[in-house]
Amino acid sequence: MPSELKVLHIVLVLLYTLSSSTYNSNGNWTLEGSAADNSIGDTILTNTKKHSCGQTFNNESIPIKDSSFSFHFLFGIVPEHTQSGSHGMSFVISPTAGLPGASSDQYLGLFNETTNGKSSNHVIAIELDIQKDQEFGDIDDNHVAMVMRLSIVYSHPDQQLNVTLFPAEIPVPPRKPLLSLNRDLSPYFLEEMYYGYTASTGSIGAFHYMLSSYATPKVENPTWEFIVVPTLPPYPKKSSDRTKKILAVCLTLAVFAVFVASGICFVFYTRHKKVKEVLEEWEIQYGPHRFAYKELLNATKDFKEKQLLGKGGFGQVFKGTLPGSNAEIAVKRTSHDSRQGMSEFLAEISTIGRLRHPNLVRLLGYCRHKENLYLVYDFTPNGSLDKYLDRNENQERLTWEQRFKIIKDVASALLHLHQEWVQIIIHRDIKPANVLIDHEMNARIGDFGLAKLYDQGLDPQTSRVAGTFGYIAPELLRTGRATTSTDVYAFGLVMLEVVCGRRMIERRAPENEEVLVDWILELWESGKLFDAAEESIRQEQNRGEIELLLKLGLLCAHHTELIRPNMSAVMQILNGVSQLPDNLLDVVRAENLRGMPETSIEVLLGLNLYSVGTMTLTNSFLSHGR
């Protein structure tokens, strides 16, 4: 078995005892197969040759039928490998002085596939097997004859066969045998038979040594003091094999080293190529800090999927943490098929990068790598406003105070973009998804990917229709021109959604409530405007502010551009500096300015004159919608 194969020299003793004579092992022996005598008189049954077998038989027959006998023998096994053995050897009693046609491997030089298992063979053998063969029903893989002496004693009167094992260094065998068999062996024997030894190898070589034998006329366990256990030579190692192994190992190590070196060079090359950046001339004029692409890779963990915050037509947004400062950031990466290209990218970094307002998402910097464009913003942990509009039972509902503040924050940001900064900026994509909420529940406008920059005093109109369906003003669809008034239209819809706690289009709502603007106007006309607010905030102490925002939202979302107020007027109403007149419902109902009562026109004039100062009536109507 494997643990005992660690002992290279396996030595046992064979002594043969017969009732009629004493037999000397130096008598006439026949050698077959790989068997050969060595220089010291021992018989070597097998050697380094694989899948071979050897036999040695005494040429003198012995009378054995109806007789008692004892066999004791000394042999040694030196396997090729210390952790695994070959197949083993056997002591055999045969009708002939040899077993022609025997096979190697598991057949041990005794039989072959045809002769194995036939009782007519009259072959009796004791296996000294060092490998378990399931097909022959081996009792286990701890085989006898590996590191022990073996005595085989058969008493014909008692019809008992005993097999005893004990260490080679002990001269006296133990009294208790390892195996005992009560059976009459006479039917298996002929009158005259021969005895000998066989051995075989498989895919692993082994030296099987037959060392000595003799006979005595009685059944007994003799003493072994006169037996000298020889020292067997180790299994030979061919220098050529050793050289081949050394060369193979060296070659393998050399190939591995070349492979590793090539891999390292490739990684460094691709990594360098991956993070290599080119600075264009147009980038010099823009103020925001340019981030190294490698820095963004580290911050976003190579833009892993688990860092993804969202994806839209503009591209993807990833969460990241800047190394060193541990500041949380949001990185917007434009996708290859994004609607946002270089022109929009330049517009964004040229505008928001210079803007500083508490209700605008701060642009920290940008990066450009290959075909991708990156914008780095402050991270807003509470996400976007749209998630608070979903009627999900698990979603925390906003209080009225939070809603009112969010509306004022968005209005303040738009006022800054439209009128307070040195240049007029049209956002063009105001919607709940672009209103981000920070950790203190402050609202900030983000995603300036569709923003357009114009010098103050020039015609602030564009020819490209952009935005999100549902939030696009009617005139923008007709003319394709975006103005500050189109931003006001979208803001009015957002205001109504925040107060009502729902989307402007609700397919699951009753038919008369599907379109938010129409439903609110219907409630207002029936004197139930307060019922449009979300139930969780519908408290009497909030009635005045709720109805104010609903009316203002309808005014801002009016389908006629000239009827909408500008953001300056909106902020004054929200701050209580200005009030909406009582007859505002007539203004909201009006299709256009023609045919509108004079008092209603005066209402519009009043709203817009707050923001345009000393402008004339005509200029007021022309300029409020920038």
From Swiss-Prot:
Pfam families, from UniProt? Answer: Lectin_legB, Pkinase
GO CC term, one of those recorded: plasma membrane
According to the record, which residues are glycosylated? N28, N59, N112, N162
Q: Which Gene3D superfamilies match?
A: 2.60.120.200, Phosphorylase Kinase, domain 1, Transferase(Phosphotransferase) domain 1
Q: Where is this region: Legume-lectin like?
A: 22-212
Which GO molecular function entries does the Swiss-Prot or TrEMBL record give? ATP binding; carbohydrate binding; protein serine kinase activity; protein serine/threonine kinase activity
What is this protein called in UniProt? Putative L-type lectin-domain containing receptor kinase V.8
Q: What organism, scientifically named, is this protein from? A: Arabidopsis thaliana (Mouse-ear cress)
